[in-house]
Amino acid sequence: MYKPFDLRTIITIIIGCGILTAMFLLIGLVLCLYSKISKALKSPGIAKEADDECYIDPCKDPHESIILANSIPAEACHSYQANTIAVASCGPLQCCNVCGVYADVNSLPPCLCSIREGL
């Protein structure tokens, strides 16, 4: 009345259990990495400081000028008395005639993009 499994059935069960175990392992790995990345982006520490330090929009306050390392002077953009913000760690910002339009919209400098953008 009791008939043992043949060899093919045992091999099929072993392969199926291995695939199922690998799927659970990969799902756990993906969830672990997702939680670590989301915690890193939500933390008020380094990500927020780096975002605030490097994000400067020259068009938000017309009384600010931006002094860049190895770039044109800020007085070339604004001809009036202005507050000064030093941005040495950021890429070069572009001065335009109209404040809301940048010279090359397709490739904005990294200082005008949030580090959380696209995630």
UniProtKB/Swiss-Prot annotation:
Regions that span the bilayer: none
One GO CC term, this protein: extracellular region
Signal peptide, first to last residue: 1-40
Cited Pfam families: FAM24
Main location class: secreted
Keywords: Secreted, Signal
Compartments reported by the entry: Secreted
Protein family per UniProt: Belongs to the FAM24 family.
Name of this protein: Protein FAM24A-like
Naturally occurring in which organism (per UniProt): Mus musculus (Mouse)
